[in-house]
């Protein structure tokens, strides 16, 4: 036979594993019973101690308060274990019931000696030095002293930290003011340098333009003058944008060199740069408006056309007469006349170019005025059409609402008429008619 197959079951009691588990459970139960018995004995001892204290209080002894005074009382010297007992009391290794029983026994023995030698022995004298030594050796006093020292250190540390924070804020404000002053000075310096450079460039360009006009013999055409003014304006805009980019790049470089705690002031620096840029733009705008006002104060073509046409015809006639006179002169005299007439010709060219510019400006103003009038007429016509459509839509909506209201009133009146007929019929019905109508129901109930 192969043996008992029940040994292969996990629940079989013959297995060593199950036997060990049963032994461990029995051992745990035995230890539990021992702990319960020990706790019961301790409670019984405490009850007996309380009973003894009650009997002592009944016999006339003062009531003992449950305080920590027993820690500072010296144990009886009869045992001969003063140091060990004191260490056990302080560390909690000795039981309180044994201490109380020993104290009771020692007090019983001392009671007889007190009665015998009451008259002979003088009362105990409290030495102030001993009292001070006991107070200084008090562990609770030491604990209080340490707590007070820790509290004072904490207060001093908080005061020192707040003072350090105030000093740091003061230093940060001082650095911020210094950086703002440096930034303002550098911005003013860059602005003045840029303004002086722009003024030099404008002066050089105006001088070059005047020299070019003196050198040229033929007047500029309107398209060419407009193109030249557009090129100058584009050049000025490109120069301003380049200066702004240079300022921004310089501001970014200065911000990168500062410490990390100054990063929150970058927005303020950006606002200052934007305000300076807007100020430069306003300066350019004022300069352009002054230039336009100066151009507007110049004589218009309508007022001076007759004068300039007369001057032009006189110049032509004078030139024709001079040319006819010069045909009979030798080459040397004709050259001298050309040199003499050079200045009037340049002045005529300047007058012609100014006349052409004024004519172009007048034509542009006329075209703009016509376009503005045309747009205004279109807007007025569109507004009239929209107003007509709105009025037509309002009329349609009001007509539709009126029809719906009439239909509702008609339906409501018909419904009221029907309900009124029903009420009138009910009022006119008699008892015989009601019984006649309900006779069929009564017959069915009888069946």
UniProtKB/Swiss-Prot annotation:
It is found in: Nucleus. It holds the Pfam family Cir_N. The keyword Cell membrane does not apply. Residues 205-217 have a biased composition (Basic residues). InterPro entries: CIR_N_dom (IPR019339), CWC25 (IPR022209), CWC25_splicing_factor (IPR051376). Residues 153-204, 223-288, 306-377, 400-417, 432-447 have a biased composition (Basic and acidic residues). Residues 153-384, 400-447 are annotated as: Disordered. Keywords: Coiled coil, mRNA processing, mRNA splicing, Nucleus, Spliceosome. The keyword Coiled coil applies. Residues 15-59, 363-403 form a coiled coil. Associated with the spliceosome. Involved in pre-mRNA splicing. This is Pre-mRNA-splicing factor cwc25. It comes from Aspergillus fumigatus (strain ATCC MYA-4609 / CBS 101355 / FGSC A1100 / Af293). The gene is cwc25.
């Amino acid at each position: 036979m192969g043996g008992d197959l029940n040994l292969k079951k996990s629940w079989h009691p013959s297995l060593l594993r199950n036997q060990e588990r049963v032994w461990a459970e029995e051992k745990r139960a035995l230890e539990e019973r021992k702990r319960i018995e020990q706790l019961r004995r301790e409670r019984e001892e405490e009850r007996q101690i309380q009973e003894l204290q009650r009997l002592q209080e009944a016999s006339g002894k003062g009531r003992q308060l449950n305080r920590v005074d027993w820690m500072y009382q010296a144990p009886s010297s009869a045992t001969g274990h003063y140091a060990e007992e004191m260490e056990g009391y302080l560390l909690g290794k000795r039981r309180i019931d044994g201490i109380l029983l020993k104290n009771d026994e020692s007090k019983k023995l001392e009671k007889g000696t007190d009665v015998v030698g009451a008259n002979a022995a003088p009362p105990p004298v409290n030495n102030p030095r001993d009292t001070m030594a006991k107070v200084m050796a008090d562990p609770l006093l030491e604990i209080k002293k340490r707590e007070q020292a820790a509290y004072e250190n904490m207060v001093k540390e908080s005061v020192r930290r707040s003072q350090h924070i105030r000093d740091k804020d003061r230093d940060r404000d001082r650095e911020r003011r210094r950086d703002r002053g440096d930034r303002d000075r550098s911005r003013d310096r860059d602005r003045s340098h840029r303004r002086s450079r722009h003024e030099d460039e404008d002066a050089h360009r105006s001088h070059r333009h005047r020299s070019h006009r003196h050198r040229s013999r033929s007047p500029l055409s309107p398209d060419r003058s407009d193109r030249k003014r557009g090129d100058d304006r584009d050049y000025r805009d490109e120069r301003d944008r380049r200066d702004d980019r240079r300022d921004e790049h310089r501001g970014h470089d200065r911000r990168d060199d500062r410490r990390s705690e100054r990063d929150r002031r970058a927005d303020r620096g950006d606002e200052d740069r934007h305000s300076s840029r807007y100020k430069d733009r306003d300066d350019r705008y004022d300069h352009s408006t002054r230039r336009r006002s100066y151009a507007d104060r110049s004589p218009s073509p309508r007022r001076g056309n007759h004068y300039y046409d007369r001057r032009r015809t006189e110049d032509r006639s004078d030139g024709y007469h001079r040319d006819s006179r010069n045909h009979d002169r030798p080459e040397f005299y004709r050259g001298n006349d050309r040199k003499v007439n050079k200045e009037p010709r340049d002045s005529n060219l300047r007058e012609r170019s100014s006349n052409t510019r004024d004519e172009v400006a007048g034509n542009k103003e006329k075209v703009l005025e016509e376009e503005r009038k045309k747009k205004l007429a279109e807007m007025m016509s569109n507004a009239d059409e929209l107003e007509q459509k709105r009025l037509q839509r309002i009329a349609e909506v009001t007509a539709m609402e009126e029809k719906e209201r009439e239909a509702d009133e008609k339906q409501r009146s018909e419904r009221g008429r029907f309900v009124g007929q029903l009420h009138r019929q009910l009022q006119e019905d008699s008892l015989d008619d009601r019984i006649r109508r309900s006779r069929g129901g009564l017959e069915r109930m009888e069946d």
